[in-house]
Each structure stands twice: as C-alpha cells, then as structure tokens.
Regions:
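Short intrinsically disordered terminal tails
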Residues: 1, 74-75
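Short amphipathic alpha-helical interaction segments
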Residues: 34-48
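Short glycine/proline-centered loop/turn elements that form peptide/ligand docking sites
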Residues: 4-6, 41-42, 64
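Short alpha-helical segments that sit at the start of domains
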Residues: 1-15
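A short acidic, leucine-rich amphipathic alpha-helix
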Residues: 28-32
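Short capping segments at the starts of secondary-structure elements
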Residues: 20-25
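Basic, amphipathic "hinge/linker" alpha-helix immediately C-terminal to the N-terminal HTH DNA-binding motif
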Residues: 58-73
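A short, conserved structural fragment
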Residues: 48-58
Length: 75
C-alpha cells in the first residue's frame, strides 16, 4: 500500500491522520469525525489488509510498513 492510496480518499486520510495523532479506537475516530461507522470500519479493514495497521485487542496500531508511511506522508 502506498501513500497515493491513502491520499486519494478524504476518509482514508482522516483515519490515517487520527491514527498518527495517537487515537487508536475506530469507533471514536468515526464519531469524532462524523463518519458512518461502517465506512470507517471498511477503511480500517483496508488498512489491515494492506499491512499498514494491525489490530491489538480492540485497538489499531501501525506496523513497520505503516510507520514508514507516517514518515513519508507526515502531518
């Protein structure tokens, strides 16, 4: 997964930025940004499938590949 995939969609960018900021609960991210929860869940599932985040319990954290994207995209 590359930065173009994330930057091409505003919801992907919002979720990515929230994860970078330290928020790791997808339900809180969706509520805070007034997103439909199912859309937020679908996007985070894409991130998991793409290998940039992984689920730890009820929370999501960046993988090594995800950390590289954080450095590339930045904030």
């Amino acid at each position: 997964m590359d930065e173009g995939f994330i930057l091409a969609n505003k919801f992907r960018r919002v979720i990515f930025d929230e994860l970078v900021a330290g928020e790791n609960d997808i339900k809180r991210i969706a509520k805070k940004n007034r997103m439909i929860p199912r859309v937020a869940q679908r996007i985070i599932d894409e991130f998991v499938t793409g290998g940039i985040v992984e689920k730890k319990g009820n929370y999501y954290v960046f993988t090594d590949e995800g950390k590289k994207l954080v450095e590339t995209i930045g904030k």
